[in-house]
UniProtKB/Swiss-Prot annotation:
One of its GO terms (biological process) is mRNA pseudouridine synthesis. Responsible for synthesis of pseudouridine from uracil-55 in the psi GC loop of transfer RNAs. It catalyses: uridine(55) in tRNA = pseudouridine(55) in tRNA. This is tRNA pseudouridine synthase B. One of its GO terms (molecular function) is tRNA pseudouridine(55) synthase activity. CDD domains: PseudoU_synth_EcTruB, PUA_TruB_bacterial. PANTHER family: PSEUDOURIDYLATE SYNTHASE TRUB1 (PTHR13767:SF2), TRNA-PSEUDOURIDINE SYNTHASE (PTHR13767). It holds the Pfam family TruB-C_2. Keywords: Isomerase, tRNA processing. It comes from Haemophilus influenzae (strain 86-028NP).
Length: 306
């Protein structure tokens, strides 16, 4: 007897997943999508299979705002093994160089200083960045090295946690586009012994609370035991994806015009500029707009239910 076909549905919000080790971000996102029976889903910045931790999954209308989380600051806890370099700069790769480790804590503290603040970083070949329409990791798997330009990133914090040779643990608060594997590889070169990542955990994306993260096995159990309405209670509101933007509340007429995608004039007593979150007179999240003087220009809007 064939199983009844799942009914996919419109469900909106952000699910804070505690990603397990060993799965790709896309595979785990698809699993979350199936458990919620959601029509649409998207993640907000891939974690390597080796990595664990916070992976916000946007469902439904929240996918329209996933770019804001891709662009958000992130925090990581990382353990590096000194003395070995690998082709992927993590423990999943092949060891390509081994060196003796004669490194003490004071040397590490000094070396860390040059990686704080605004720096340039050359992305790893084992990344999803594209060259001529093809991901770099595909070239890398063929043994081809492509010249990459250094990109500006910001390391807001780089904190020493502990060092028990050859293992070094650090805490990193960084801007978008930062490759922790590359950071560790570069640090290993400065220390003169090489290094690669053995453990990586993302501890924060934007301002999302760590306490709200849910492991996939827990979500699976809930999905097997409770109706979908109980799963929906785990979702954070869609507007949390853009919580960094200032809020602008509209009156009834302004809300109606924005709903039609029209530009709206307003007094702009708060002297707002740039992007804002829009809320209706009933305090419903409408989307994101650009403020240009006293004009509200809609950019990304929620599709309102009939």
């Amino acid at each position: 007897m064939s199983r009844p076909r799942k009914r996919w549905r419109d469900v909106d919000g952000v699910f804070l997943l505690d990603k397990p080790q060993g799965m790709s971000s896309n595979d785990i996102m698809q699993k979350v999508k199936r458990l919620f029976q959601a029509n649409k889903a998207g993640h907000t910045g891939a974690l390597d299979p080796l990595a664990t931790g916070m992976l916000p999954i946007c469902l439904g209308e929240a996918t329209k705002f996933s770019q804001f989380l891709l662009d958000a600051d992130k925090r990581y806890l990382v353990t590096a093994k000194l003395g070995e370099r690998t082709d992927t700069s993590d423990a999943e790769g092949q060891v390509v160089e081994t060196r003796e480790v004669h490194v003490e804590t004071p040397q590490i503290l000094t070396a860390l200083e040059q990686f704080r603040g605004d720096i340039l970083q050359v992305p790893t070949m084992f990344s999803a960045l594209k060259h001529n329409g093809k991901p770099l990791y595909e070239y890398a798997r063929q043994g081809i090295t492509v010249e990459r330009e250094a990109r500006p990133i910001t390391i807001f914090e780089l904190n020493f946690i502990e060092y028990h040779a050859p293992f070094l643990t650090l805490e990193v608060h960084c801007s978008k586009g930062t490759y922790i594997r590359t950071l560790v590889d570069d640090l290993g070169e400065v220390l003169g012994c090489g290094a690669h990542v053995t453990m990586l955990r993302r501890t924060a994306v934007a301002d999302y609370p760590v306490a709200e993260m849910i492991p996939i096995n827990e979500l699976q159990l809930l999905a097997e035991s409770f109706p979908l309405s109980e799963l929906d209670r785990l979702l954070l509101p869609t507007d949390t994806a853009v919580s960094k933007l200032p809020a602008l509340h509209l009156d009834v007429e302004q809300s109606k015009a924005i709903g039609f995608g029209q530009r709206v004039k307003f007094a702009n007593e708060q002297q707002l500029g740039g992007q804002v979150r829009l809320f209706s007179a009933e305090n419903l999240f409408l989307g994101v707009a650009l403020i240009d003087g006293n004009i509200i220009r809609p950019q990304r809007l929620i599709t309102q239910s009939a």
